[in-house]
Amino acid sequence: RKESSAASDVYKRQLVQDPFCGSGTLVIEAAQKALNLAPGLRRRFAAEHYDFVPAAVWAEERQKALAASRLDAGFEGFGFDIDPNAVALANANAKLAGVGDRCRFEVADVKDFAPRPSSIILTNPPYGERLGDAAEAAALARTLGQVWQASPTAGLYAITADADFEAHFGKKAAKRRKIYNGMIPCQIYMYFDRPVKPVRK
């Protein structure tokens, strides 16, 4: 999944931010990875009622997963979105995922976003296919770039289908990776904790 790919660097980090958090997926999955929480740990499955799988097997595996978790990890996750309903949903999702005490979501505009030094920014900014307005998506990417350049020591991973993202953002990515968001071809634009070359006009 795109979320898991983008969160793969989190084990090194203690602070993750997302200025376009939506329902909180990126920050929540980053928290689960940092804490080494097994997928589905808090869920129940129909297969648990199968006669040919002893209940003790499920209990043993669930206990192993709990023992492997790193609940002492110093992780903090912060998400921001201009939509109050999305923020409310993100906070609810974090609680359901068992990371409500590690993730906080607030209503805020991207222009007011303040990247923290030494953090990693994971984000899936709105783009044409999702937003319905390519010009507005470009403006959001431009604002994100301006905000990020105020604190370029923060690493940033942006998932988008915008082929001109680098030009709108104002910086050439250190690395890119092609992925799919459902049926939409996208790329992860990676900006590491070091200066990167500006895009040539």
Feature names for model-found ranges:
Residues Q14, T25, I120:
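Hydrophobic "anchor" residues on beta-strands that sit immediately upstream
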Residues R13-F20:
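Conserved class I S-adenosyl-L-methionine
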Residues G24-I28, L35:
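Glycine-rich SAM-binding Motif I of class I
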Residues Y157-K201:
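Class I S-adenosyl-L-methionine
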Residues F20-G24, G182-M183:
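A short acidic Gly-Thr/Ser loop motif
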Residues Q14, G74, P195:
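Positively charged, low-complexity nucleic-acid-binding target-recognition regions
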Residues A34, G40-K172:
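S-adenosylmethionine
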Residues R1-A7, Y11:
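Single conserved hydrophobic/aromatic residue that forms the stacking wall/gate
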